Amino acid sequence: MISDIAAAAAAIGAAAVTAQVNIEANIAGIKDEALIAELSGVAALADGVADRAARVVTAVREEIST
């Protein structure tokens, strides 16, 4: 069902945000600047993933409400 797509997208969004917060928390203890830069870049990707997931959820909700 289409609602399963929304549920999966919401789970993906939550996973992306969780990963981002985890990376940000762990960066505080890292001294290697190159690794910090790499991890910061990866963490920034999570914003895009969470945003896309939210758009999918919104699209599904719009579809089922019409």
Report residues per predicted region.
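A structural signal for small-residue-enriched, beta-sheet-centric alpha/beta enzyme cores
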Residues: 1-66
